[in-house]
């Protein structure tokens, strides 16, 4: 009995404390739940950024930057230039342009030695015909460069149809295959060079006196030695040479046309990309592409081969638009312009710096990726593969026939093709507005794809190869042959009248204003560097110092360095 009395107070105390313990516990649980509700979610900085992954099956993704597989909506036909049907090539001589038989002097012979790659030599051949006409001289079929970096033993007749060349131009300039004999011996020529951009007066004052005295003159290293500003008849003669008289040989034409046919079998439309991304090209440009110390060491080693090559400021080069676009940047530009992953691309290029690693982003964006080596067998290419100029001619033909031609750098082949495509119908020719695009590429991961693609389309207006895109007389004539492009004003007026009848005048005007932009409407900052010399011309001038003040005689100098000619290596 006493035992139960002792336990009673203990149970009473426990019974009174239990509600208090329960109340405190519930309060703590409620407080914890309330704090959990108010706490912010884990920050973005705590998450690992998604890894950039290139795949042809999925959209390429980067932080905040999602690249679509499709080209997306576009306010233009991506396979043709607006209003191209109202413009056409016109290069016939005027009635004032006398026949060659009436002006050619029988005691004047002009020999031309070209330099550089195939397309740089092409500019020399075209200008050689005009120079002979200025001097009223007989032109000997130009000599191709066989001694420079390319070491291609091909002569004119291996690349071009020489008989067609002579016959087509017979009314303009008398052309012969070789110098005639003089007293039973080969004629001795006086060798000389002329300044860059030499005009008619320049040839009359500097070359003609030597020609009158020696009767046979050889102009060496003949590239860009004729002014861009000549009389209309001489400019039209340039066009007749470039777009009609210079025809590739039958073997080159046959193989080139077969490559085009195979591309057409794969797709109705295709893009041709001339990709200049060789190690030597990048070393010369002085640009930096983010490859770290490895890239700096490799390109610096290449630069050391040329004592005359100064080191450029990489950032300045980018700002001035002098850095070739990377393969990835070309792909992004094309996607932004409306070309989807289903588009087929033919790539004309030499050795690509970084190899497959550099090409991977472009191939991920455009998996239908071809070159002459992938659509032709080694046996088919064997007659051409040992000759760089013949291989370049095959690429030229495919690029010329492509629906859209794109370049990542404005070299000789890009310039020649741009002018040719303007003359033959203004097929789309995309030249990157590198001055504007470089900042966009650098900051792409800080923007959305929609904003990025909109800016690319805006920046590329005036750089798409459309009619009247460049003011007449601007830049290299081979790139902008404005004298040889005529407008069908009657057809254009008729089309505008029909448009008004259909009540579409305002819509048509607005669309034209949104797409067709001339350089007259662009600021100086936006204007392409048409008047600036490209890398080939700059480097040639290192070897031609002093020529602008006088014409120099050209002798073989045994002390000349054996290092490769940089201009020839970088020309195309």
Curated annotation (Swiss-Prot):
Its membrane topology: Single-pass type II membrane protein
Which GO terms fall under biological process for this protein? fucose metabolic process
The residues that carry sugar chains are 92, 136, 446, 506, 549
Q: Which residue intervals are annotated with compositional bias (Acidic residues) in the record?
A: 521-541, 554-566
Renumbered to this chain, region (Disordered) spans 498-572
Transmembrane keyword on record: yes
Pathway terms, separated by semicolons = Glycan metabolism
Report residues binding substrate: 274-276
This protein's name: O-fucosyltransferase 16
